[in-house]
Amino acid sequence: MAALLNDAEIEERLGDLTGWTRQGNEIRKTFQLPSFPSAIAFVVNVAFLAEAAGHHPDIDIRWRKVTLSLSTHDAGGLTGKDFDLAAQIDEII
């Protein structure tokens, strides 16, 4: 099981990301895409990253907006896995 990050580690890792915010025991970001089909294509690409990482975000799709939430549920909070996947997601947008 991945180790939980403390508040200082979380803030440091958040500083390395753009647009991600902490919401309790998760980090979240909303992506604005040019169209609904491009939003779906983005989610498909996120799914491939998530499968490769063995770590899956919660996904909310609202027309052209996709909100991703990351938390390591089996650890009960935020771990390095969440921030690593967030960084990978940011690379594909």
From Swiss-Prot:
Keyword Lyase: yes
SUPFAM superfamilies in the cross-refs: PCD-like
Catalytic activity, as annotated: (4aS,6R)-4a-hydroxy-L-erythro-5,6,7,8-tetrahydrobiopterin = (6R)-L-erythro-6,7-dihydrobiopterin + H2O
Gene3D superfamilies in alphabetical order: Transcriptional coactivator/pterin dehydratase (3.30.1360.20)
One annotated GO molecular function: 4-alpha-hydroxytetrahydrobiopterin dehydratase activity
Chain segments annotated as coiled-coil in the UniProt record: none
GO process terms (BP): tetrahydrobiopterin biosynthetic process
Superkingdom, natural source: Bacteria
EC number of the protein: 4.2.1.96
Root EC class: lyase
Keyword field contains Cell inner membrane: no
Keyword terms of this UniProt record: Lyase
PANTHER family: PTERIN-4-ALPHA-CARBINOLAMINE DEHYDRATASE
Family affiliation: Belongs to the pterin-4-alpha-carbinolamine dehydratase family.
NCBIfam families the record matches: PRK00823.1-2
Name of the featured protein: Putative pterin-4-alpha-carbinolamine dehydratase
The species this protein was found in: Roseiflexus castenholzii (strain DSM 13941 / HLO8)
